[in-house]
């Protein structure tokens, strides 16, 4: 079984923990408990290019609060996928994807070369909630739209934008989509590298390998 390390980052109260608990334990926590660090695991069988493959998802939950800024990166080494979370009803958490979280990942990318970024919008059930809309309107804001999420993902060079609600919809499908996109992007990188090597050689030219005595 293949293992994939997935680290969730983003502002506190964006729904990271609820989402992971719902995915792995099929229950929705009613009380908000701030996370320091937590690990979860989920096993999934996912079709990749028409072939069913089994994966063990190692899910790392991190604290978004500023007081954990020096500790949080300790979970980054060896990461395959970073999930950058924002909450659709919290525009500030959306802005902080670019203001904080992308910069933090970039600062530690040496410990996780090849890691891919995905932007995840949570609490989609609140996008059409009248109370949420009214509260945000009073502050001159609005629930983040799907289009805005897609544009943000493109802006920061993420693989994709996905969204879901841990309460109501689309949770397992989101993780299937993320894993499929991750492995398809890796295949494209390998294919591109192979094509570059092929084009670099002149027609009929033999490949010469130099071996050092040292």
What are these regions (language model features)?
Residues 72-73, 102-110:
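Short amphipathic alpha-helices and their capping/turn segments at secondary-structure boundaries
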Residues 63, 89, 167:
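Adenine-nucleotide cofactor-binding loop residues
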Residues 59-60, 83-87, 119-122, 163-164:
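Conserved beta-strand segments of the P-loop GTPase G domain that flank and frequently precede/overlap
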Residues 25-33:
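Post-Walker A helix-loop "phosphate-sensing" segment adjacent to the P-loop in P-loop NTPases
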Residues 54-68:
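Switch II (G3) loop of P-loop NTPases
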């Amino acid at each position: 079984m293949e293992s994939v390390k997935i680290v969730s980052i983003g502002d506190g109260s964006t729904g990271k923990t609820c989402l992971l608990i719902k995915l792995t334990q099929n229950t929705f926590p009613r009380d908000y408990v701030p996370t320091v660090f937590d690990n979860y695991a989920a096993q999934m069988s996912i079709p990749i290019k028409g072939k069913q493959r089994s994966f063990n998802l190692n899910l790392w939950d991190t604290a978004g609060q500023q007081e954990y800024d020096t500790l949080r990166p300790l979970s980054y080494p060896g990461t395959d996928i970073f999930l950058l979370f924002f909450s659709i009803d919290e525009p500030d958490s959306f802005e902080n994807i670019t203001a904080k979280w992308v910069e933090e990942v970039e600062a530690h990318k040496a410990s996780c070369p090849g890691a891919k970024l995905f932007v995840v919008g949570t609490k989609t059930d609140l996008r059409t909630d009248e109370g949420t809309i009214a509260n945000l309107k009073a502050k001159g804001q609005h629930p983040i739209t799907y289009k805005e999420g897609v544009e943000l993902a493109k802006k920061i060079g993420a693989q994709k934008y996905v969204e879901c609600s841990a309460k109501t919809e689309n949770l397992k499908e989101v993780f299937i989509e993320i894993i499929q996109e991750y492995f398809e992007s890796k295949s494209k990188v390998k294919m591109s590298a192979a094509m570059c090597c092929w084009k670099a050689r002149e027609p009929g030219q033999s490949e010469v390998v130099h071996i050092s005595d040292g």
